[in-house]
Amino acid sequence: MHTLLLLAALSNQITFTTTQQGDIYTVIPQVTLNEPCVCQVQILSVRDGVGGQSHTQQKQTLSLPANQPIELSRLSVNISSEDSVKIIVTVSDGQSLHLSQQWPPSAQ
């Protein structure tokens, strides 16, 4: 049983830390890997609002250590009640590791 708990704690995962001040959301995607990795990181931001639609994409290759949360970026987004915003983070080593996570968990 303890081995299963330890494995679960060390699982590869992408998480988001989010703070809000008024309509400004600061979103910080973090990745924790159980093996070190030279990975391709892609962050896609899609926004639909009264003023139109915008897409922003960042791609970079990072050397990520194992077993510690690493901040991948820091995005500040002004989101009004009429806006729909989706941020998708993908981390891949091009072989066996492929993680993808969306913020917010279910699109607004």
From Swiss-Prot:
One GO BP annotation of this record: pilus assembly
Pfam families named in the record: Tafi-CsgC
Record note on disruption phenotype: Cells lacking this gene make aberrant thin aggregative fimbriae (Tafi) which are composed solely of CsgA. Normal Tafi are composed of CsgA and CsgB at a 20:1 ration.
UniProt cross-references to Gene3D superfamilies, sorted A to Z: 2.60.40.2420
Expression triggers: Expressed at low levels in agar-grown cells, part of the csgBAC (agfBAC) operon.
The organism's place on the tree of life at top rank: Bacteria
Keyword annotations from UniProtKB, A to Z: Chaperone, Periplasm, Signal
Signal peptide span: 1-8
InterPro entries membership: Curli_assembly_CsgC/AgfC, Curli_production_prot_CsgC
Compartment(s) where it occurs, according to its Swiss-Prot or TrEMBL record: Periplasm
One cellular component (GO) term of this entry: periplasmic space
Family: Belongs to the CsgC/AgfC family.
The protein's role, per its UniProt record: Plays a role in the extracellular assembly of CsgA (also known as AgfA, AC P0A1E7) into thin aggregative fimbriae (Tafi) fibers. Assembly may also require CsgE (AgfE). Tafi are thought to be assembled via an extracellular nucleation-precipitation (ENP) pathway, and possibly also via an intracellular non-CsgC-dependent pathway.
NCBIfam families: PRK10102.1 (NF007507)
Protein name: Curli assembly protein CsgC
Gene behind the chain: csgC
